[in-house]
Regions:
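Metallo-beta-lactamase
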Residues: 5, 101-150, 156-225
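Conserved beta-strand hairpin/beta-sheet module of binuclear metal-dependent hydrolase folds
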Residues: 2-57, 161-171
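Histidine/acidic-residue-rich catalytic or RNA/ligand-binding cores of hydrolases
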Residues: 224-233
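Active-site neighborhood of phospho(di)ester-bond hydrolases with catalytic His/Asp-centered motifs
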Residues: 40-43, 64-71, 92-94, 151-153, ...
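C-terminal regulatory/interaction regions
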Residues: 244-300
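Charged, amphipathic alpha-helical linkers/stalks
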Residues: 232-250
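Active-site metal-binding motif and surrounding structural segment of the metallo-beta-lactamase
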Residues: 48-94
Length: 300
């Protein structure tokens, strides 16, 4: 288990999974200040024991809030189990996602269909008691104010949370891999993807006055402008590249699009600096993002 303290009051808990390349990929955030403790994206069921042990090491006896950026299994699947350990916790979730966290049967079924064995590794989504979950904006807890912003580009239930100068991004700006000062960024546009909504969500997040952005995948960055400029450029570049290959009738489509992106996309420029198993992981998720864009272009 690894716990990092990048800033005062802020901790990263690594949630590595027993899958190829699934390290430096998932994390949960813990924010502690003046007796208040907040967890952002507790992760899947499989690593709730890791998070609980981390909270124990951080001397957390009371968990006040669990903030869900969205209800995908890798971010929210373990929330119900975490509530069993901390029954006083209030789970904050987009209104569209509340019913799916109270009764996650359809969400679990969809996760298994979409992710296959990866969902099985993550573990079945744990139900959150209805009395523990809801939505309010802002959340005021003593001197701490949590402002919430709807950013539905990656998922309809996606939210970003601002606490002071920190912005918890979820996946609104994609996926970061820690490479010292250099930026590796990969977009997250799974089906169903709608370009206009995704771009508006990115622009909304980019407009906020913050000093650090905290990713659901993975870690944090303080070059905030660079992150959003790269993400916006990447969004438009990927869409244009996918459209070019649709018009050309490229086959095999995914392989040719991805090869093109590795040559022309600045967010992916450090792809070959990644460990080989992480490259394999990133290719799988990139192909899924390509599919989201292809479906959008063919159906609009």
């Amino acid at each position: 288990m690894a716990i990092h303290k990048p800033l005062e009051n802020l901790y990263i808990v690594d949630l590595d999974q027993p899958l190829e390349g699934f390290y430096n990929f998932l994390n949960s955030w813990v924010y502690k200040k003046d007796g208040l403790t907040i967890a952002v994206d507790p992760g899947p069921r499989s690593t709730i024991p890791v998070l609980v042990e981390a909270l124990k090491q951080l001397k957390v006896e009371r968990l006040d809030y669990i903030l869900l950026t969205h209800i995908h299994i890798d971010h929210a699947g373990g929330a119900g189990l975490l509530v069993k350990h901390f029954p006083e916790a209030r789970v904050i979730c987009h209104p569209k996602g509340v019913k799916h966290m109270v009764d996650p049967s359809k969400l679990w079924e969809g996760s298994r269909q979409f992710l296959g064995k990866v969902a099985d590794v993550y573990g079945e989504i744990a139900a959150v008691p209805e009395k523990n979950i809801g939505y309010q904006n802002p959340v005021e807890a003593g001197d701490v104010v949590i402002n919430i912003f709807e950013t539905p580009g990656h998922a309809p239930s996606h939210l970003c949370y601002q606490i002071g100068n920190l912005l918890f991004l979820g996946e609104v700006a994609g996926i970061n891999y820690p490479l010292d000062r250099a930026l590796y960024l990969r977009i997250a546009t799974p089906p169903p993807f709608i370009y206009e909504i995704y771009r508006a969500s990115l622009e909304k997040a980019a407009s906020l006055d913050v000093s650090h952005v905290c990713f659901g995948h993975y870690g944090y960055r303080k070059d905030v402008r660079n992150v959003f400029d790269t993400a916006l450029n990447q969004l438009d570049n990927w869409l244009a590249t996918v459209e070019k290959h649709i018009r050309a009738g490229s086959d095999p489509f995914d392989e040719l699009v991805y090869a093109d992106l590795l040559k022309n996309d600045r967010g992916l420029s450090l792809y070959y600096s990644l460990p080989t198993d992480v490259q394999s992981r990133e290719k799988i998720f990139s192909v899924n993002s390509i599919k989201g864009m292809k479906d959008y272009l063919q159906n609009k």
